[in-house]
UniProtKB/Swiss-Prot annotation:
Odorant receptor. One of its GO terms (molecular function) is G protein-coupled receptor activity. It comes from the Eukaryota. The lineage of its organism: Eukaryota, Metazoa, Chordata, Craniata, Vertebrata. It is found in: Cell membrane. It is a multi-pass membrane protein. Disulfide bonds join 97-189. Belongs to the G-protein coupled receptor 1 family. This is Olfactory receptor 6B3. Gene3D superfamilies: Rhodopsin 7-helix transmembrane proteins. It comes from Homo sapiens. The keyword Transmembrane applies.
Amino acid sequence: MSGENVTRVGTFILVGFPTAPGLQYLLFLLFLLTYLFVLVENLAIILTVWSSTSLHRPMYYFLSSMSFLEIWYVSDITPKMLEGFLLQQKRISFVGCMTQLYFFSSLVCTECVLLASMAYDRYVAICHPLRYHVLVTPGLCLQLVGFSFVSGFTISMIKVCFISSVTFCGSNVLNHFFCDISPILKLACTDFSTAELVDFILAFIILVFPLLATMLSYAHITLAVLRIPSATGCWRAFFTCASHLTVVTVFYTALLFMYVRPQAIDSRSSNKLISVLYTVITPILNPLIYCLRNKEFKNALKKAFGLTSCAVEGRLSSLLELHLQIHSQPL
């Protein structure tokens, strides 16, 4: 476009979920309830872990760090989406869009590394139980969590710097409900091959290497479990890892479907539904997956909030049932 007057885009318009006006208020209510559920669940986990000395162990330290991440994660996306549903205010400034993209990308990258750290914790617990407290110390846990956040936010800063240097002109309509990389680059009117290459390389590093580390940990865990002679021992070992493995499977399945496929840059409506899975639904399901069948945590929650054991299980089960009913409705 050299030699031509180029009007740079100063604001973007988020298409969101085009529906009838009446349905916008219903979607606002559904996502508001989901957002509140995420806040309540994850805050309850953080408060329970930090107030119960019986939970001052590496597994629960990682869990509380994950809960902190989930609160930040959903708070980056949902408030702007709720504003669009309620006030029909779908504009977002260029700086606001880049900021939202930066935090979203940072939190996704951080979660990848944090899940790999949690897989290592499970590996040591299953394969080296007698040396667990020697190998997985509080200092190591702090270093792993710190490395997860530092690496995630540093890599994302590089990615967003390259993306923000691209010129955007002409159409400013983002066919999405938040600022994601693919729909943003679709609006570029200058060559963005460098930004795309940098994004691909960094995404490969931060997604694939933690995934390989997680898979390697579970390969060793599987071999160790198969060597356990008793069925009861096998079941206990599997139960120790089942929650984390479920979360890893859901998280990476959604990410790989969204970004590791041909023509991912074509922003289609189906992408929005997958994005809802890992930006809104996953943060509310993760605490339930980790804690619903964890008797130790439910007992600590009972002591922390003065609830009976049956009440804790009943409220968690009711919350999961209500959430599934809400999101079984078509958007």
